[in-house]
Structure formats: structure tokens, C-alpha cells
Amino acid sequence: MTKYTFKPKDFKAFNVEGLDARMEALNEYIRPQLHELGEYFSDFFTSQTGETFYPHVAKHARRSVNPPKDTWVAFATSKRGYKMLPHFQIGMFEDQLFVMFGIMHEAKDKATRAKVFERKFKAIQQLPDDYRVCLDHMKPDKPFIKDLTDDDLKEAIQRAINVKKGEFFIARAITPQDKRLKSDKAFIAFLEETFDQFLPFYSA
């Protein structure tokens, strides 16, 4: 019995038709693990940064028709929410588990906060080859950093700084069949390794 990780069949919750039925599937197959990950990693971030972090599991409460295509737990230093702050995420689409750190378009003082990525441009480029960027958290697309030109990356960061709807995340994503999802130990090790790479961008 696993506590934190996800099986390939859990991702099939996103194939369930209809809002109520899909929410029921998410509640059964995915949300229990997200709550456990929320407890584990809010403690992890608190111990790593010296700031108190709170977990926020997606509720999808505003939806009335369209079922969610993704779900997540986010970590930020506010009990009230995470969207206004730089934050960490563990989440899922039907074809991927993703891990991210960055800034949404709704963030307070977004232009100033996003400049951390401008200052640490070289550090982004030096992340391992399987690290990615996400420029729209609502879409599954996450190009590999190694596949972007300097100009592509600079433009993406500038968009987050200057455009109202712009956002920027550094990310990592694996498939539902990935061996790092086979056990809690392997999954937690993967997540901790990823967040260790992200933390210097938070504290910069």
C-alpha cells in the first residue's frame, strides 16, 4: 500500500466524463495522495527555508460544467492561498506528473518577483537536461530548457515580467509509467531532488 505515489490507473481519472463523475474519481484516486504530499512537503519547505509553508490542494470549486483537466497541490507561505505568491507545485495532467516552481499571472508585484529568473538566467540554463519551463500553467506543454535558445528563454522571462497574463515556471515532468512512481521511496526522492534544484530560485 502506497501513501504518496500514483499508479498509471490513477491518471485515468482524467478520462472520466462529466464534472461530478470526474470529481468523484479525483477524490478517490488522486486527492488522498495530494493531501499526504501536502503534509510532507509543507514540512520540507518550512525546514529548508525557515519560513512556514502551507499546502493548498486544488478544490476546483468554481467549476460548474467543464471537468478539470489537471489537479495539484501547491505550497506557499500564506494560509489563505498561493496564487499571489511565488510557489511550488506537484500536479497531474492525464499524461504527466509535473513539479514546478514559479509565478502565476495573478501574483502580487509580479514584475519584481519574476526578475529572480532574469537574475538567475545562467542557473536556469545549468539545470539538468530533463528540466523544463512552463509558460502557461493551464496547458500541459513544458518545453525542455535545453531545447530553447538564449533568446527564447529571455523572451519567456520578459513576458512574465512585462505582460499581464505572462507567467514563468521552472518544471520537471514524468509519464504515468515512469519508474520513479513505482514506490513512495523513489517518488519522494525524485520530488526532493527536484525541489532542491528549485529552492535557490526561491531564496534568491
UniProtKB/Swiss-Prot annotation:
Locate the coiled-coil region(s) and give their ranges: none
Family matches, as Pfam families = DUF1054
Q: Which organism is it from?
A: Staphylococcus aureus (strain JH9)
Q: What is this protein called?
A: UPF0637 protein SaurJH9_1166
Instruction: Describe the family membership recorded for this protein in Swiss-Prot or TrEMBL.
Output: Belongs to the UPF0637 family.
Q: Which Gene3D superfamilies match?
A: Protein of unknown function DUF1054
